[in-house]
Amino acid sequence: MAHKKGTGSTRNGRDSNSKRLGVKAYGGETVTAGSILIRQRGTSVLPGVNVGQGKDDTLFALTDGVVAFESIRRSLRNRKRISVVASS
């Protein structure tokens, strides 16, 4: 006979680290080439002029300039597009 109560096991107790997704440079901000603009999963925001897209869908600036967001109309749903306007 056991004189101590056996402790049960649980299948909980795990959680992943946050991935720090989101907008890193907002509209009107000045950025340099290579700056990360948005970290995202999937293309919720589309790349525009002077913006590149990494293999993990991260959007980054290709040139120095000012960040500009615009709303574009697509079939079924509206989308956002981010561009970098060259500062003069």
UniProtKB/Swiss-Prot annotation:
Where are the residues of the annotated region Disordered? 1-24
A cellular component annotation (GO) from this entry? cytosolic large ribosomal subunit
Q: Which family does it belong to?
A: Belongs to the bacterial ribosomal protein bL27 family.
Write down the Pfam families for this protein, in alphabetical order: Ribosomal_L27
Keyword annotations for this protein, in alphabetical order, are: Ribonucleoprotein, Ribosomal protein
Its GO biological process terms? translation
The record lists the organism as Prochlorococcus marinus (strain MIT 9313)
Protein name, UniProt field: Large ribosomal subunit protein bL27
Indicate yes or no for the key word Ribonucleoprotein.
Answer: yes
Instruction: Give each disulfide bond as a residue pair.
Output: none
Top-level taxon = Bacteria
| UniProt xrefs under HAMAP family | Ribosomal_bL27
Alphabetical list of InterPro entries matching this protein: Ribosomal_bL27, Ribosomal_bL27_CS
